[in-house]
């Protein structure tokens, strides 16, 4: 499949799941790139949770609204969300509306802060678990997210 827009020459070597410009941009700029900052890691973990049972394209389309409604996945802001916030989010059609996934996002923010506190006390945080130079994955094997 060849994909290209504007001045960009079409590429033939995209994976089969890349079917449109949004997925192409994601593949070219984010796929396989390690996420090393706290906010980015929290966003990725939470969006992967929302994606469960759905396509990643669905999440990509809704990601701007997720960022807006979930305080840009800043953990210190997310942990302040209340039951009223959960109810408000359940009414917003711009995101995937699943009570358990919304509640898990708030819980993940709390756990992120706990990891940060552990790191300040000498423990490692999630950033200590990614491979700094990446890892080559043989063709046909699944890729790592981190």
Identify what each model region corresponds to.
Residues 1-146:
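HhH-family (HhH-GPD) DNA N-glycosylase catalytic core used in base-excision repair
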């Amino acid at each position: 499949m060849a994909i290209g827009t504007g001045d960009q020459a079409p590429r033939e070597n995209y994976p089969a799941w890349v079917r449109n410009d949004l997925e192409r941009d994601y593949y070219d700029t984010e796929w396989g790139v390690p996420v090393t900052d706290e906010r980015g890691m929290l966003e990725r973990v939470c969006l992967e949770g929302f994606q469960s049972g759905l396509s990643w394209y669905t999440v990509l389309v809704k990601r701007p609204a997720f960022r807006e409604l979930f305080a840009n996945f800043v953990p210190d802001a997310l942990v302040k969300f209340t039951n009223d916030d959960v109810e408000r989010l359940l009414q917003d059609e711009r995101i995937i509306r699943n009570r358990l996934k919304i509640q898990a996002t708030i819980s993940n923010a709390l756990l992120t802060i706990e990891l940060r506190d552990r790191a300040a006390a000498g423990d490692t945080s999630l950033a200590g678990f990614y491979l700094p130079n990446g890892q080559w994955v043989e063709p046909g094997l699944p890729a790592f997210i981190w």
